[in-house]
UniProtKB/Swiss-Prot annotation, chain A:
Subunit structure of this chain's protein: Subunit of the heterotrimeric GatFAB amidotransferase (AdT) complex, composed of A (HER2), B (PET112) and F (YGR102C) subunits.
Record's signal peptide: none
UniProt keyword annotations, A-Z: ATP-binding, Ligase, Membrane, Mitochondrion, Mitochondrion inner membrane, Nucleotide-binding, Protein biosynthesis
CC per GO annotation: glutamyl-tRNA(Gln) amidotransferase complex; mitochondrial inner membrane; mitochondrion
Gene Ontology molecular-function annotations: ATP binding; glutaminyl-tRNA synthase (glutamine-hydrolyzing) activity
Top-level lineage group: Eukaryota
Enzyme class, first EC level, given as a word: ligase
Keyword Ribosomal protein: no
Name of protein: Glutamyl-tRNA(Gln) amidotransferase subunit F, mitochondrial
Source organism per UniProt: Saccharomyces cerevisiae (strain ATCC 204508 / S288c)
Note: Present with 172 molecules/cell in log phase SD medium. This protein may be expected to contain an N-terminal transit peptide but none has been predicted.
Protein's membrane topology: Peripheral membrane protein
């Protein structure tokens, strides 16, 4: 029922491989089927769900085995996150992380299509294959920069410490403990 | 039907709706009254709008519904706010949300949950999140339109639950300068309204390159998209196999089939389509978005702005922990998960794998659309589709109590709410959730190829 289209990075990155006669090579991936001719075909198609998100993610199933990260690992994560240890319910965080990880660890078993040619940085939603900047071009770019009111760069228009809860003589204040007694 | 409502009327009704549904975090005591001198056909002069409280405004506070930014007032307006003010829009207030946009129920706010106004006489039901207040402000007819933000469905899900239109444009179309970052590779400003003509005008007003936003779609690429536009007749619509789930809200299929019949009668062609990567989207999303959130929220130390602990900057040897303890529970959970995904033990296994699978998803979408993708250089599939139609939610809005209980059992229970919306966020596609029936929280998303926002808007207008 489905036509299939090969994604071809040799001709057009992320695009379709075109053989010049408006026909595409079939290898899997996304597929478009034949046009529905009537509502009965559509009803039939919609009456057959193909998967259950609960089953796929192993939620509410007996097979779900949770392996919580250790208490030490949780404490390390709290430190990395700038969150206090005092008052933190370590066991609760362990269990919660275990459930979150059982959910996202599904990734391990999913094969990447065309792994060799797939670049993780193409996941960014910006133009692919832009021209590379080099040191000279960077310097050239900087040399043309000037103060721009459109960017809010207006001299004297803004007091840097104006939004700080504590400041002194136009400096930000960090308390003494910040520099001492650090682990 | 008039485009603009009376500002006086909105202000009069606001207080009773606010006390019932907890829609706003702050209300503008003197809404703007600016005349648009240009008087173009896109003018929004006199329209009333609300702004989600994670978009900065210099005239009243921006809190992200968090203790961390309580009383914070930005020294500047976000670009989208500036453009609305220039267009003569009255801004009624800032709307409630899940703290920093993290949540799908609209319940994680220091101001308390937003209550769904579609159920005035029943047990309090969720509005959906995170743009919960934005959707409620539109559903209550307090505003002509609302600005929200959509990271994984945060405009579309509450729009569905409030039975209003919710549009997430292509990533990069609307400026994010002044939008407080949650997950920068996904965050998009979105528009909610009851009327497609209003939504379209707002979109055209805001759809501009902004040099202040490094991810703003360039002028060159916008011109390329315009150049790619051709009349496509008949319009080809796809129904995605992977979005066909066993559990759908009661009444969904009847309304869905009725719409499909209407499309056939209008001469549109309908095709089955399979996009296998759609199944992988929730694990991809919940690997990437908390990692980006952990990075973005590391800036809140209390030194330069926002809340600061009055006694200490360090506790247990952890910098800024006394201040950062004021984050809400859901935000803390996502920061911890994000840092786990980013730490050296897990980095290669989780983060990069998720990025590569995201590329697979984008490429699969490219494979089924007729319109080219200017970001990936896909030339478009000449036999491809123009529009996909996808359900917005697999559930009806439940009670706030049930939602909180389910979420406490496992965070995955609330993550599942995003199953129909996250794929388009990961691929940056324009997606508009429209109600299938008036005052009914059942919606359908109309999805186009990257950059093809106008086809999505035209399609919805043609069937409204």
């Amino acid at each position: 029922m489905y036509k299939t289209w090969r994604l071809c990075r040799t001709h057009t990155v992320g695009g379709l491989c075109h053989d010049g006669s408006h026909r595409f090579v079939s290898t899997g991936g996304a597929k478009i089927g034949k046009k529905f001719e009537n509502m009965n075909q559509i009803r039939d198609y919609l009456s057959r769900p193909v998967w259950s998100v609960h089953e796929y993610l192993g939620i509410n199933t007996k097979e779900e085995k949770l392996e919580p990260p250790s208490a030490e690992a949780v404490k390390k994560l709290l430190r990395l996150s700038g969150l206090p240890l005092e008052g933190a319910d370590i066991k609760e965080i362990q269990m919660r992380l275990a459930k979150q990880l059982s959910f996202i660890n599904k990734l391990h078993n999913i094969p990447v299509e065309g792994e060799k040619h797939t670049k993780e940085y193409d996941a960014r939603l910006v133009q692919r294959n832009t021209k590379q900047l080099n040191y000279t071009k960077l310097l050239e770019g900087i040399s043309h920069q000037k103060q721009d009111a459109e960017l809010g760069e207006v001299s004297g228009s803004w007091k840097a410490t104006g939004l700080a809860a504590e400041s002194k003589n136009a400096y930000f204040v960090v308390k003494e403990g910040l520099l001492k007694n650090r682990k | 039907m008039p485009l603009k409502r009376s500002l006086k009327e909105s202000i009069e009704r606001l207080s009773s709706f606010q006390s019932k549904y907890n829609i706003f975090t702050s209300i503008n005591p003197s809404p703007y009254s600016i005349t648009n001198k240009k008087g173009t056909k896109e003018t929004l002069t006199g329209c009333v709008a609300s702004i989600k409280d994670n978009i900065v405004t210099k005239d009243f506070p921006t809190t992200c519904a968090s203790h961390i930014l309580e009383n914070f007032k930005s020294p500047f307006d976000a670009t989208v706010v500036k453009l609305l003010k220039q267009a003569g829009v009255h801004i009624l207030g800032k709307t409630n949300l899940d703290e920093f946009g993290m949540g799908s129920g609209g319940v994680h706010s220091i101001r308390g949950p937003v209550i769904n106004p579609l159920y005035p006489h029943e047990d309090k039901k969720i509005m959906g999140g995170s743009s919960s207040g934005a959707a409620a402000s539109v559903a209550c007819d307090l505003v002509d339109f609302a600005l929200g933000t959509d990271t994984g469905g945060s405009v579309r899900l509450p729009a569905c639950y409030g039975s209003v239109l919710g549009f997430k444009p292509s990533y990069g179309r609307l400026s994010r300068f002044g939008v407080i970052a949650y997950s920068q590779s996904l965050d998009t400003v979105g528009i909610l309204s009851k009327k497609i003509n209003v939504l379209r005008k707002v979109f055209h007003t805001l759809d501009k390159y902004d040099m202040k936003d490094p991810t703003s779609l360039s002028v060159e690429l916008r011109e390329l998209i315009e150049g790619n536009k051709k009349v496509r007749r008949p319009l080809k619509v796809g129904i995605v196999k992977e979005f066909s789930h066993e559990s759908m809200p009661i009444g969904f299929h009847r309304l869905y089939l009725s719409l499909l019949e209407k499309l056939i009668n209008l001469g549109l062609e309908i095709y089955p389509v399979s996009i296998p990567s759609v199944k992988n989207c929730l694990p991809i999303y919940y690997t990437l978005s908390p990692a980006e959130a952990a990075s973005n929220l590391s800036r809140y130390d209390g030194i330069r702005y926002g809340y600061r602990d009055s006694e200490l900057d360090i506790k247990d040897g952890i910098l800024f922990a006394p201040t950062r303890s004021k984050f809400g529970t859901e935000v803390k959970n996502r920061i911890i998960l994000g840092n786990y995904n980013l730490c050296s033990d897990a980095f290669k296994n989780n983060f990069i794998k998720a990025e590569k699978l995201r590329v697979n998803l984008i490429d699969e979408f490219d494979g089924i659309f007729r319109f080219p993708n200017v970001l990936t250089n896909s030339k478009g599939n000449p036999d491809g589709l123009d529009i996909l139609i996808v359900p917005t939610s697999s559930k009806l809005p439940g009670s706030i109590r049930d939602f909180e209980e389910e979420e406490a059992k496992s965070p995955a229970n609330s993550y599942i709410n995003d199953v129909f919306t996250v794929p388009m966020s990961l691929a940056g596609l324009p997606s508009l959730s429209m109600p299938l029936k008036e005052k009914t929280p059942i919606g359908l998303q109309v999805v186009g190829q990257y950059g093809d926002d106008s086809t999505v808007l035209d399609f919805v207008e043609s069937i409204s």
